[in-house]
Curated annotation (Swiss-Prot):
Record protein name field: Leucine--tRNA ligase
Short motif 'KMSKS' region, span: 632-636
Protein's gene: leuS
Organism, as annotated: Sinorhizobium medicae (strain WSM419) (Ensifer medicae)
InterPro entries (alphabetical): aa-tRNA-synth_I_CS, aa-tRNA-synth_Ia, Leu-tRNA-ligase, Leu_tRNA-synth_edit, M/V/L/I-tRNA-synth_anticd-bd, Methionyl/Leucyl_tRNA_Synth, Rossmann-like_a/b/a_fold, tRNAsynth_Ia_anticodon-bd
Gene Ontology MF term list: aminoacyl-tRNA deacylase activity; ATP binding; leucine-tRNA ligase activity
Motif 'HIGH' region mapped to chain: 43-53
Location in the cell: Cytoplasm
Gene Ontology cellular component list: cytosol
Protein keywords: Aminoacyl-tRNA synthetase, ATP-binding, Cytoplasm, Ligase, Nucleotide-binding, Protein biosynthesis
Family: Belongs to the class-I aminoacyl-tRNA synthetase family.
GO BP: any one term: leucyl-tRNA aminoacylation
PROSITE patterns per the UniProt record, alphabetical: AA_TRNA_LIGASE_I
Length: 876
């Protein structure tokens, strides 16, 4: 019989309303079932969701719906990471208040997410800019302050003189502010810091316990924490060359074994020796100033040309006072790592080699590969950075690098300079304390007051929240809180005299470092309900982009430890399982070249194919448009597809199914119109097959078949069920999709038989059982279609509340087995035979194999050894 096409515009809102009315995705903390907490990284409310959001939140939703069906009490909340610069930019550019801009964006994005049919517990929703949320964040800040985990110090910052604000290292590009283009200045400002370095070793060691995290992310964090074991070595300075009072220079090195290859020392532009030298030389002063302006991000330092200037200062080699080395100021040495001074061994470090070649400094090889000849081993354009044997190193010659390290360390620890040991062993970390001060309005106010008499005074918890004043203006650069006529003026909580509020706000990474904890009990007066937090945490499955591998995830790991230290939670690690999904990418389209190039949106072109060639044509002008590379969807390249358009045209289930189906979830998915249309055809096919057979299926009782025509149907359904279960457990959604396609192909003919009234009762019962399994399998990915199909075949209740089906173990057992066949103990063939075949059947089948016939050459075997279910050996 003919059936109406599936209409997502009708079905999807209808089922969403039903789920909402029944509050079926609201989670109760006191539910006795085993908990499962699935969370996708919450979005910044930019105003529109993009296809990356669709993929991210669909993946989380599949996990949530699947785990719910498996009997878990699932927590799947949603909120908004709502503070930050874009809202202030909008205020400056469009004259809207950051709060109204943000909440308006939240409303429109929430509506978009709801249309996707996500099984979210919206009753726990919050935005980090809600005073109710940041009040609890201020409470945590005060607890951390009391515990000694927060402190204030003078710190060098990148200052943008046009925007009147501090820039992160990553926001300094070629010495200029990323937004204003102004030359950045270095300023000393008093800033607030979290003591993340107190946890450096623990944060590093605990990475080994995170076995459900991608190895790549763990390695990135390990490198960021950057533990190194080395030696702090004091070098005597030649007093005749020193411009100030300094008598020695302390250098941190991880390679003391290469000391005899040293040809220079290098210090940071902010080192006291550099300041002394700069005070006596305008040239050195200018160079130091240039170093400070260039930015200190690691990316900037890696790519910048290695530059230096000789200070004229000379240092005496620790093992030879007659050997003096020049001390340079260099742009690649950081004051806040080690001691702000290094020694350069050009033969063992590429950066040092480039520097030495540039400034004509000696290059002495001191380590060579074990099998090299010391007479002929030289350093060319590349330093030798491997382990090996020491050469040209006096008493170290012939030792391994490890032995040389120990020999140098032991000697220098005993050697005295000015009455104290010349060296000590040190463990260093690259990780720095987290500076959280931001000179911004749209962030969480730091709850302290500055009093001339009492100093820094915490705001009493009874006075929280310290809320942002709504009446601010953005007509001038800088922080509006500094200019506010009344907000910053307040009485000191201790002495009652006039005092000033802190006008810095917190880094927005603070807001996202504990939100997952707040979701466990967002109604609590305190930051957490420890009982609820300890019940739900860690998050069982956290899903988000690899771009957050370091900062957000590391800060969250620190925050959980700090919250444990202050009694808010009882665990160290916030995320048990981490999944980093790939991006949604799309072809780029453009016309023109160079500066005249204009990017064209996918909606403006059509693709034509002829003779195996694809070309893009502008819909309005018919001109040919250049097809460019496949890149991450971005507004700048205009290669974006609006989820609203896709959902309006095809429905949410098609969009959800497509972003899961086309490639492994950790890889990028290439968006294509053909792929989306293919997904939509599949949606329609599933609906057509089931709805046309609905009358016959509705009247039948579901029962798997043990024999006859229905047996193959039941075996296919139950085997697919078992396999897709494993796929969902591993988040291998694309594999699940492939198996579901196969099952639908298997069910097509028997469903057509039922639709035509040509199936007997046993087959119909088996197909109904299989159809129920199919609907359960697609439900996590295409929940609206699943509900519609379930209702059509006479299913009771909601699929969203139905338990996961159980596969029948007897139906998933493969009826055939493949046995290796050996001849005289060497494998020669494989035999596929019925699992329950007896000894004589196996022997007959083996003797019929060509390879066995050839080996026997007409004679009988001496014996045939059959190890049941394992192997067959023919002795000839």
């Amino acid at each position: 019989m003919a059936t109406e096409r599936y209409n997502p515009r009708d079905a999807e809102p209808r089922w969403q309303q039903q789920w909402e009315a029944g509050k079926i995705f609201e989670t109760k903390n006191d539910d006795p079932r085993e908990k499962y907490y699935v969370l996708e990284m919450f979005p910044y409310p930019s105003g529109r969701i993009h296809m990356g959001h669709v993929r991210n939140y669909t993946m989380g939703d599949v996990v949530a719906r699947y785990k719910r069906a498996r009997g878990f009490n699932v927590l799947h909340p949603m909120g908004w990471d709502a503070f930050g610069m874009p809202a202030e930019n909008a205020a400056m550019e469009r004259g809207v208040h950051p709060a109204s801009w943000t909440y308006q964006n939240i409303a429109s994005m929430k509506a978009q997410l709801k249309v996707m049919g996500l099984s979210l517990d919206w009753s726990r929703e919050f935005a980090t800019c809600d005073p109710e949320y940041y009040q609890r964040q201020q409470h945590l800040f005060l607890d951390f302050l009391e515990k000694g985990l927060v402190y204030r110090k003078q710190s060098k910052v990148n200052w943008d003189p046009v925007d009147n604000t501090v820039l992160a290292n990553e926001q300094v590009i070629d010495g200029r502010g990323w937004r204003s283009g102004a030359l950045v200045e270095q300023r000393e400002l008093t800033q607030w810091f979290f003591r993340i370095t107190d946890f450096s070793q623990d944060l590093l060691d605990s990475l080994d316990t995170l076995d459900e995290w991608p190895e790549k992310v763990r390695l990135m964090q390990k490198n960021w924490i950057g533990r190194s074991e080395g030696l702090s070595v004091r070098w005597e300075l030649d007093p005749a060359t020193v411009p100030g009072e300094e008598k020695e220079l302390t250098v941190y090195t991880t390679r003391p074994d290469t000391l005899f290859g040293a040809s220079f020392l290098a210090i940071s532009a902010d080192h006291p020796l550099a300041r002394d030298a700069a005070a006596k030389s305008a040239e050195i002063e200018a160079f130091c100033e240039e170093c400070r302006r260039a930015g200190t991000s690691l990316a900037a330092l890696e790519t910048a040309e290695k530059m230096g200037i000789d200070t004229g200062i000379r240092a005496r080699h620790p093992f030879d006072p007659d050997w003096e080395l020049p001390v340079y100021v260099a742009n690649f040495v950081l004051m806040d790592y080690g001691t702000g001074a290094i020694f350069g061994c050009p033969s063992g470090d590429q950066r040092d080699l480039d520097f030495a070649r540039k400034y004509g400094l000696p290059v002495v090889p001191v380590v060579m590969p074990k099998d090299a000849d010391p007479q002929t081993f030289t350093i060319g354009d590349e330093a030798y950075v491997g382990d090996g044997v020491m050469i040209n190193s006096r008493f170290l010659d012939g030792l391994s690098t490890e032995e040389a390290f120990e020999t140098i360390a032991t000697r220098l620890e005993k050697d005295l300079l000015n009455g104290t040991p010349r060296a000590e062993r040190k463990v260093n970390f690259r990780l720095r304390d987290w500076g959280i001060s931001r000179q911004r309005y749209w962030g969480c106010p730091i709850p302290v007051i500055h009093c001339d008499d009492c100093g820094v005074v915490p705001v009493p918890k009874t006075d929280l929240p310290v809320t942002l004043p709504p009446d601010v203006t953005f007509d001038k650069p800088g922080n509006p809180l500094d200019r506010h006529p009344t907000w910053r003026h307040v009485a000191c909580p201790q002495c009652g005299k006039d005092a000033r509020r802190e006008t810095d706000t917190m880094d927005t990474f603070v807001d996202s470092s504990w939100y997952f904890t707040r979701f466990t009990a967002p109604w609590e007066d305190g930051p957490t309900d420890p009982k609820a937090a300890n019940h739900w945490l860690p998050v069982d499955q956290y899903i988000g982009g690899i771009e957050h591998a370091i900062l957000h995830l590391l800060y969250s790991r620190f925050f959980t430890r700090a919250m444990k230290a202050t009694g808010h939670v009882a665990l160290d690690e916030p995320f048990k399982g981490l999944f980093t999904q790939g991006m949604v990418v799309h072809e780029t389209y453009s016309r023109g070249e160079g500066a005249q190039r204009e990017w064209i949106t996918p909606a403006e072109i059509r693709i034509e194919e002829a003779d195996g060639q694809r070309r893009a044509v502008h819909i309005e002008t018919s001109e040919e448009i250049a097809i460019g590379s496949i890149e991450k969807m971005s507004k700048s390249k205009k290669n974006v597809v609006d989820p609203d358009d896709i959902i309006a045209s095809y429905g949410a289930d098609t969009a959800r199914f497509f972003v899961l189906s086309d490639s492994p979830p950790d890889r990028d998915v290439i968006w294509s119109e053909a792929g989306v249309e293919g997904a939509h055809r599949f949606v329609q096919r599933v609906w057509r097959l089931l709805s046309e057979a609905a009358e016959g299926l509705s009247a039948a009782e579901a029962a798997p078949a043990r024999e006859g025509e229905g047996l193959a149907v039941s075996q296919a359904a139950h085997r697919t069920l078992k396999a897709v279960e494993a796929d969902y457990d591993k988040l291998a959604f694309n594999k699940a999709v492939a198996r579901i396609y196969e099952l639908v192909n298997t069910l097509a003919a028997p469903l057509a038989q039922i639709a035509a009234g040509k199936a007997d009762q046993a087959l119909t019962a088996a197909v109904k059982d299989a159809a129920g399994i199919l609907i359960s399998l697609i439900a996590p990915m295409m929940p609206h279609l699943a509900e519609e199909c379930w209702r059509a075949i006479g299913g009771k209740g909601l699929i969203a509340e139905r338990p996961w089906p159980k596969f029948d173990a007897t139906l998933v057992v493969e009826n055939e087995i493949t046995l290796p066949v050996q001849i005289n103990g060497k494998k020669r063939a494989d035999l596929t035979i019925a699992r329950d075949a007896d000894q004589s059947a196996i022997e007959s089948a083996v003797l019929a194999l060509d390879v066995v016939k050839t080996a026997l050459n007409g004679s009988n075997p001496k014996k045939i050894i059959v190890v049941p279910q394992r192997i067959v050996n023919v002795v000839v």
